[in-house]
Amino acid sequence: MPRVKGGTVTRQRRKRVLKLAKGYYGSKRTLFKTAKQQVIKSGQYAYRDRRQKKRDFRKLWITRINAAARMHDLSYSKLMHGLKVAGIDINRKMLSDLAISDEKAFAQLVSQAKEALK
């Protein structure tokens, strides 16, 4: 049985990896071995950060809500508890958006939360 060298397959595989490594710095874009390692690591970073992004946005929304609530003499936790007691079911993304874009509506929600806490 003759030996198969697989030159075409190897070249295609290497081209595919080097194409994915386009834009990397230094030898990580030109040398196959380091490019392959970096492509694998980049995939791990991407996987991790897709999950991290959700946590980061939630933290951002909470920070914005807290800042807006403190302008109305209320802490974030008391505001959220007051909204829950008042039966107002609004998520943090929408509440953060209201705090930035529509201050009057946010002030009404804060006053309802304060009433519910009394």
Swiss-Prot record:
The GO terms this record gives for MF are:
rRNA binding; structural constituent of ribosome
What's in the GO CC field? Answer: ribonucleoprotein complex; ribosome
Cited InterPro entries = Ribosomal_bL20, RIBOSOMAL_L20_CS, Ribosomal_protein_bL20_C
Q: Name one GO biological process term.
A: translation
Question: What SUPFAM superfamilies does this protein's entry cite?
Answer: Ribosomal protein L20 (SSF74731)
Please give the coiled-coil regions recorded for this protein. none
Pfam families assigned to the protein according to its UniProt record, in alphabetical order:
Ribosomal_L20 (PF00453)
What Gene3D superfamilies has UniProt attached to this entry?
6.10.160.10, Ribosomal protein L20
Listed A to Z, the keywords are: Ribonucleoprotein, Ribosomal protein, RNA-binding, rRNA-binding
Q: Which NCBIfam families match?
A: rplT_bact
Role according to the record:
Binds directly to 23S ribosomal RNA and is necessary for the in vitro assembly process of the 50S ribosomal subunit. It is not involved in the protein synthesizing functions of that subunit.
Q: Which family is this protein grouped under?
A: Belongs to the bacterial ribosomal protein bL20 family.
The name this protein goes by in its record: Large ribosomal subunit protein bL20
Please spell out the taxonomic lineage of the organism that makes this protein: Bacteria, Bacillati, Bacillota, Bacilli, Bacillales
Q: What would be the name of the gene that encodes this protein?
A: rplT
